């Protein structure tokens, strides 16, 4: 599973990049989506790599995102009680583990919004003009995306 977080706006952006961000449902800065690893999403990530931060996410990080930022239709928070009532899983952590293993999808939870609206990172970005490998905030974080997600919880 990949976590993709939009970090830059759309001013002076090429139309194909805007379209790809729209297809990924990354309509605003600090929005986060979780997608599966397949060639289609890898190609889409490659197109928007200069506007987003992305990396491989684990079950614990996904559970943290869902607990802090998971919203239902109507704006209510995602709770353990809602998960237990509307699915075969007993808690958010159990559901997140199933999603990370590929046994379930985020869309299996009725009413769960597909986009997580994150806060700006605590202590700020490292810089939005450079990639993560160059000391900035954009591009591929790999497994270290969890640190950025933790700052933006």
Curated annotation (Swiss-Prot):
Q: Which family does it belong to?
A: Belongs to the universal ribosomal protein uL30 family.
The record ties this protein, via PANTHER family, to:
60S RIBOSOMAL PROTEIN L7, LARGE RIBOSOMAL SUBUNIT PROTEIN UL30
According to the record's subunit comment, the protein's assembly and interactions are: Part of the 50S ribosomal subunit.
Q: Name one GO molecular function term.
A: RNA binding
Listed PROSITE patterns: RIBOSOMAL_L30 (PS00634)
* UniProt source species: Methanocella arvoryzae (strain DSM 22066 / NBRC 105507 / MRE50)
- Establish whether keyword Nucleus is in the entry: no
Q: List the SUPFAM superfamilies.
A: Ribosomal protein L30p/L7e
- The protein's superkingdom reads Archaea
Q: Which UniProt keywords apply?
A: Ribonucleoprotein, Ribosomal protein
Under the heading Pfam families, the entry gives: Ribosomal_L30
Q: What is this protein called?
A: Large ribosomal subunit protein uL30
What InterPro entries does the annotation carry? Answer: Ribo_uL30_ferredoxin-like_sf (IPR036919), Ribosomal_uL30 (IPR039699), Ribosomal_uL30_arc (IPR005997), Ribosomal_uL30_CS (IPR018038), Ribosomal_uL30_euk_arc (IPR035808), Ribosomal_uL30_ferredoxin-like (IPR016082)
Q: Which HAMAP family match?
A: Ribosomal_uL30_A
């Amino acid at each position: 599973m990949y976590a993709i977080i939009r970090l830059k706006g759309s001013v002076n952006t090429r139309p194909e990049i805007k379209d790809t961000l729209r297809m990924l449902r990354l309509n605003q800065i600090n929005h986060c989506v979780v997608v599966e690893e397949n060639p289609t999403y890898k190609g889409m990530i490659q197109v928007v790599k200069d506007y987003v931060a992305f990396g491989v996410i684990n079950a614990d990080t996904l559970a943290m995102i869902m607990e802090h930022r998971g919203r239902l239709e109507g704006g209510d928070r995602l709770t353990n009680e809602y998960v237990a009532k509307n699915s075969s899983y007993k808690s958010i952590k159990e559901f997140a583990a199933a999603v990370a293993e590929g046994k379930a999808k985020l869309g299996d939870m009725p009413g769960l919004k597909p986009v997580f609206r994150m806060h700006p990172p605590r202590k700020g970005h490292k810089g939005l003009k450079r990639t993560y490998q160059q000391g900035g905030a954009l591009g591929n974080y790999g497994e270290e995306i969890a640190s950025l997600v933790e700052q933006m919880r």
